[in-house]
Amino acid sequence: MSLYLYACLGDEYDYKPNYKCDTAGIPYSHAPGNIGDIEIFNGDRYWLIEATLIQGKAQQVNSETINLFRHIDDEHSGTKYMSLVAPYIHTDTELLLKVATIVSMEEKKSLLFSKPYNVSDFINILKNGDCIADMQDTTWRFVAKLGDFLNKVHLPRG
């Protein structure tokens, strides 16, 4: 995946694959604990990509979502991005990622954009579009929908 990212994005970014590879560069295991699989960064952006073969709801939600937020590198300044890439993305995984992104932005007082992708969508957006813009659009649309809903609801304040 790192080579494909480089082929699509070029020299604009620095790439740091953290997964374990053999001498030919073929991955054979995930990244060690408390670190994401692939980190991509430049002066004003930090992008964490977690790649997994896990497809089940319980495993995705429990093993591949909230951990991403712990893996985000707070030492890099600028806007942060996160992608979860799997053969299948469960709808609960997508919802949890959206909500946790908003909570994380509020807690850390910094911009964070995220989106889970199935493998074919991730390949297509990298090849034909702008993954960064796609993550931004997805996050801002969710924020807008949430804001619209909250503005319409008149709950008693206590």
Placement of each model-derived feature along the sequence:
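Catalytic core segments in nucleotide and nucleic-acid processing enzymes
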Residues: M1-G158
